[in-house]
UniProtKB/Swiss-Prot annotation:
Species this protein is from: Desulforudis audaxviator (strain MP104C)
InterPro entries to which the protein is assigned, alphabetical: Ribosomal_uL3, Ribosomal_uL3_bac/org-type, Ribosomal_uL3_CS, Transl_B-barrel_sf
Organism placement in taxonomy: Bacteria, Bacillati, Bacillota, Clostridia, Thermoanaerobacterales
Cross-referenced HAMAP family: Ribosomal_uL3_B
Gene3D superfamilies for the chain: 3.30.160.810, Translation factors
Record-given protein name: Large ribosomal subunit protein uL3
Length: 213
């Protein structure tokens, strides 16, 4: 199983453009990466695997329930709005209470970004799955409806059949995006290309599975 080298939680701020040394304008996504606090470590000896639990965006203690208050209290850190666990190669490289910032990554590094895609609501087969539409002529019995769902023999629709339904609002990973700029003072990462989600949504930036081989 592949284990990532490093990762951080962040917030998508929006898109902009960045000019390379050759004067080429490239689209970039600005991500507020951290600061993230290490709330818990998990090791193979105690939990069976290596991972770190990161907290992102502080929030008042009155907005945290009692179990989480105790969890943050045992770690000796302030409560966080978001709490996510990331699998790592070796949890011994981290300490509880350690703060991770944008300078965790370097310019030119290849990363994967995980986020929740924009919700589009209920959508038909053409928009949701890219189906071809039917004839638009006057005599046609269908235009944008899906065709046959199955053969007559099974007398049922198999699971996984592509049909109209809710589009978006799911976990999406975009792989092999290049970091073109790091601003450690403002905890900003400029990542080349688009990142899933709306402005202000939570994203996870982590070492690429394939790009750094």
């Amino acid at each position: 199983m592949w284990l990532m080298a490093k990762g951080i939680l962040g917030r998508k701020l929006g898109m902009s453009r960045f000019f390379t040394a050759e004067g080429v304008a490239v689209p970039v996504t600005l991500i507020e990466a951290g600061p993230c606090t290490v709330v818990q470590k998990k090791t193979p000896d105690t939990d069976g695997y290596s991972a770190v639990q990161l907290g992102f965006m502080e929030q008042p203690a009155k907005r945290v329930n009692r179990p989480l208050k105790g969890h943050f209290g045992r770690a000796g850190v302030k409560p966080s709005r978001f709490l996510r666990e990331l699998r790592v190669a070796d949890a011994a490289d981290y300490e509880v209470g350690q703060v991770l910032k944008a300078d965790l990554f370097d310019v030119g590094e290849i990363v994967d970004v995980v986020g929740t895609s924009k919700g589009k609501g209920f959508a038909g087969g053409i928009k949701r799955h890219g189906f071809h539409r039917g004839p638009m002529g006057h005599g046609s019995k269908y235009h944008r409806r899906p065709g046959a769902l199955a053969a007559k023999g099974p007398a049922r629709v198999f699971k996984g059949r592509k049909l109209p339904g809710r589009l978006g609002g799911v976990r999406v990973t975009v792989q092999n995006l290049e970091i073109v700029k790091v601003d450690p003072e403002r905890n900003l990462l400029a990542v080349r290309g688009a990142v899933p989600g709306i402005r202000g949504s939570l994203v996870v930036v982590k070492s690429a599975v394939k790009g750094n081989e």
